[in-house]
Swiss-Prot record:
Enzyme class: transferase
GO BP term, pick one: L-tryptophan biosynthetic process
Organism from which the protein derives: Hahella chejuensis (strain KCTC 2396)
Binding site for Mg(2+) 1: S93, E227
Binding locations of anthranilate 2: R167
Cofactor(s) named in the record: Mg(2+)
Database matches in NCBIfam families: trpD
Name of the protein described by the UniProt record: Anthranilate phosphoribosyltransferase
Binding-site residues for Mg(2+) 2, renumbered to this chain: D226, E227
Binding site for anthranilate 1: G81, N112
Length: 346
């Protein structure tokens, strides 16, 4: 299907088939569509609301065109959100990645620089001294040896360059916000995905079911966070054993006291790093305790998704142990020194 015909169909509020979406995405990702056509198509999709079939088709094309990171591990997991929640919270899922690694998981952390927040995962890792310009082989080695590696989206999704201009100029959420977590270059089948709207939980779980994922938690908190919140209940769509179930999680389910998010918002990557370090080292005040608790909640979900724990509660307990032992913070420092070696080689 030609992108012009696709725009006309979507403007009429008709869903594209998965096959039609594949054809249109191939035109976008190979430079055959003009910036005006890309912008018009993305806005029309957003107004209609993207269907499960459309998201699936788009994700398939992005996966095919991505440069792969070769990792074969039964506990390989990703912690990646859609962003766009407007909270400016510190990088919780990035901190959680080091906790999961310390608990015995392997984390292929997929992420990018900030688009809508004050600090994207790439921004805070760079502030921590981690080299983002590692090759796919070097990232794979980091994951195998340390338990965590960072997959910088632009390095693995070079075909995305055709859509960057229209996305930046429009400045609104589009289907591409959802595609980041669905297109991990390491091909993870286990993950926790945070989304900005609870209505997206079930559709994205259905997309991942179609794409072959095995254990996924798609989470969206009642306060709008694209994380499991410390302050309120969180809606979850869980894909496990081929079935999807929906339920609500609370901090109390994991034995953690509910607290406000005051003090956990940041204005820069450096401020985010300060809170991550506070969460992973010694609790000195209420803010560092809250930071530690929200990281433990989200790391616990990822430990459970990685099938290292039999329940969310057990996952959170394992996360708390990994933080308390100092191992999680050690993983952060280890990745920084490991990645610096490759910087010196260049």
């Amino acid at each position: 299907m030609d992108i012009k015909a696709a725009i006309a169909k979507v403007v009429d509020r008709k869903d594209l088939t998965t096959e039609e979406m594949i054809e249109v995405m191939q035109q976008i990702m190979t430079g055959q569509a003009t910036p005006a056509q890309i912008g018009g198509f993305l806005v029309a999709l957003r107004f209609k609301s993207e269907s499960v079939g459309e998201i699936t088709g788009a994700a398939q094309v992005m996966r095919q065109l991505a440069s792969k990171v070769d990792i074969d591990d039964p506990h390989l997991v990703d912690t990646c959100g859609t962003g766009g929640d407007g909270s400016n919270l510190f990088n919780v899922s990035t901190a959680a990645a080091f906790v999961v690694a310390a608990a015995g998981g392997k984390v292929a952390k997929h992420g990018n620089r900030s688009v809508s927040s004050r600090s994207g995962s790439a921004d805070v890792l760079e502030a921590a001294g981690i080299n983002l310009d590692m090759t796919a082989e070097q990232v794979a080695r980091a994951i195998k040896e340390i338990g965590v590696g960072f997959l910088f989206a632009p390095a693995h999704h070079s075909a995305m360059k055709h859509a960057i201009g229209p996305r930046r100029e429009m400045g609104i959420r589009t289907i591409f916000n959802m595609l980041g977590p669905l297109t991990n270059p390491a091909g993870v089948t286990k993950q926790v995905i945070g989304v900005f709207n609870p209505l997206l939980c079930l559709p994205l779980a259905e997309v991942l079911q179609r794409l072959g994922s095995t254990h996924v938690l798609v989470v969206s908190a009642a306060d709008g966070l694209d994380e499991i919140s410390l302050a309120c209940e969180t809606h979850v769509a869980e894909l496990k054993d081929g079935k999807i179930s929906e339920y609500t999680l609370t901090p109390e389910d994991a034995g953690i006291m509910r607290r406000s998010l005051d003090g956990l918002t940041v204005a820069s990557a450096e401020e985010s790093l300060t809170l991550i370090e506070a969460a992973l080292t010694k609790v000195t005040d209420q803010t560092s305790q809250k930071a530690r608790d929200i990281v433990a909640l989200n790391a616990g979900a990822a430990i459970y998704a990685a099938d290292l724990a039999s329940s969310f509660k057990e996952g959170v307990e394992m996360a708390q142990d990994a933080i308390g032992s100092g191992l999680a913070f050690a993983k952060l420092k280890e990745l920084a020194s490991f990645s610096a070696c490759f910087k010196e080689e260049e």
